Amino acid sequence: MGIIDVQRSHLTATPSKERDAPAHPPPTILPVCILFPYTSIALPVLMYYIPEKGQFDQNPFLKLIAILPPCLYSAVQFPLLFLGNPESSCTPRPALYATLYLLLDASLLAFSAISILSIAAFTTTEWNSDEVVAVCSTLLPSLLVLPAHLLSTSCALTPGSIGFTDSSVDILIDLLMVSLLAAGLTLNVDESWRFFPYICISSLVLVLAKLLRKSSSMPRRDPAPAPAWRIAAFVLIFGLSMFVYFSILYECLLIFGNHFPWFPSQAPSNDLTNKW
């Protein structure tokens, strides 16, 4: 009986160890170069301080350096979030849940499309004032990078366990990132463009802190159903991300309306700070 008991305990212990073993890191945490979100903010802010403001319209390459990194990071990251959970489409779900996840997937792809559209819009518009330069090279990178970074590193999008996943110090970093997004949108409405570089530099520090925390932390285990407060935190982050990206889309449409007479638009001018 002793041998049988040992064999039984060995057979039952193996699945338990497999369940308790940490899973591989989610593919959405390490999809792009780990420094990509950091450089996506750092390069544009360098473009704000190094060249003379009037050189941007003379040299479109400077515009591209400021606009391309954050737009490219956002455009790549959201499809990776969409593809990061292939089993979600194979699991049968109630109609309401299936509709919600369909809207979630459609929103991620829409965010990516808006990021690509922003490359064309913000590089073709004239950077003819300090306000426009501040919006494009300091505020816009923060608005593009922070939502993508939060949804990639702080949230689980797996059906059945969707929610906010961070803990301890990471929660404080995430809260500060959300506050920066809200502050950036508010300052833009108030046309307080002189504060945009502070928003950008603060975003740079927080992204670097988050990257250092993630690189030294343990991999996340298999997802489990999230408590209500974590779902509410995810809804807050995702809702703010939707507001940010559709505000950027609105601005892109206004820019295209100024450049193409056939494009429907009611924009009176090309001053970015008067449109968001």
Swiss-Prot record:
Residues 1-24 are annotated as: Disordered. InterPro entries: UPF0328. Pfam families: DUF2463. Belongs to the UPF0328 family. This is UPF0328 protein ECU01_0090/ECU01_1520/ECU02_1550/ECU08_0020. It comes from Encephalitozoon cuniculi (strain GB-M1).
